[in-house]
C-alpha cells in the first residue's frame, strides 16, 4: 500500500533545503545505475510504486521521455519570491507544480510574531486550500514533512502557524526538520525567533529533527570543504548535508530494502513519551567526497563530533532510544555487530536497552557504496535548548528589539513561552538524572491496576507495604504486601502507562 508524504518547505532556508533535497532525490530516481534492472518494474516503466510516496503521476506505463510530467509532492511557501523563483528557473523546475507554490512580496521582517500572528492568520485559508488539494491526491497519506529555519521570520513564525494548523486539521504524523541559528547569526532578532518557534515545534510536531548552522560549519571545516573559487558556497554545501540526512531518512520509503522503515515507525519506536520528541542525528559519510574505507568505518565515524548535526556528544547524555538507517548492499549481521559496539559506548536507559530500530535500504546513495544515518533520542539535546534560552535572556533582560514583538504579543505571552522552554529543559534534565520521567506523564489509573500508586515527594511510606527496589522512581509506592513480589517496575515497559 502506498503511503504518501507531503513536503512543506517554508521560508528561505526551508525552500533552499527543499531545493537540495529534491535535486538529489530526482537524480536518485532517474539515475540509470539505480534503474538498470527496469524489467523488474515493467517493460516501459522506470520507477516502481514506492516512488509515488514522493511523486505524483507515477504510472505503470510511465516512459523516460515523459518524465517531466512527474511532480514532486512538495509545497513551497515563502513571504518573498527570491528562492522560489530560483527553484523554478533551475533544472528541476518541471518537477514542481506551480499551483503548489505560495509566495508574497512583503517578507516577515525577521519577526516571529509578525509571521505567526499576522501573516499566519492572513494567509491561512489560501495555504490550507493548497494543502487540502494535495491531500486529496493521496490514496493513503502517511505524514507531513516540514523544513524551515528558526532564525528568520517566515520559517519560524509562519512555519509555526502552519504546523499548528496541520495539527488541528490532520491526524497524520508531523515531522519537523528545523535549523537552529548559529551564535553569530546575521539576523539580530534570531534569539527571539528561535525561542518562540521552539515551543510551537515541540508542541505540535510528532517528531523533531533539529540541525544547527554551527555544527554544519564544523563539518565543513573538518572535511576541508570551505568555499573555494568557482565552487559551491558554504550555505549550499550545508544545505546539501541536511538534504542527505532527509534522503537517508526516507530511503526505505523510496526504494526496496530488506528492513524498510517509514516515518511512522521512527515516531513509534523512538519516542517513549510524546513530550520527548527531539532526535539527535549524525550522518556518515556527511559529504560525497568523504572517503569511507570499510563498512565498519561508517559506524566508527557516526558518533564523532564532526558527524553530528547538532553540537552535542551523544555519549554524554542518557539515550532513551535509537535508530540506525543504512543504505547499500550490506549484510544484516555486519550491521548488528556494529550496532552492539555503538550501544556499548552509549549511556542507555537501563530498562529500555532494546529500544533500537534498524533499517536497511538496498539502494546505495549517489557516489558512495553505502551510508549510515543514526538517530538518538538523547537527553543531551537539553544543552541546545539551554543555549537558545541563554541567547533569548541576553536580549530580553535589556528589552532589546522587544518592541517589534510587543506589537503582537503581551509580556504575559512572552513569560509563558519562557516557562515552556524552562519546563522542556527541566524534564530532559530530570530523566537524565533519575532515569525515569516525572510522574505527570503517567496515567494514575493504569498504575493502580498494575499494583502501584503515585505518591508525592512529601508522602510518608506505610510500614505495611514494601519499599520499591532502587531501580524504581521515588514517586511510585507498591500496593503489594511484602509476600507478593509478582509485579516489578520493569513490567511497565510492556504495558501502556502513559
Name every feature range the model reports, one short phrase each.
Residues 1-459, 465-498:
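Terminal, contiguous helix-loop blocks that mediate binding/assembly
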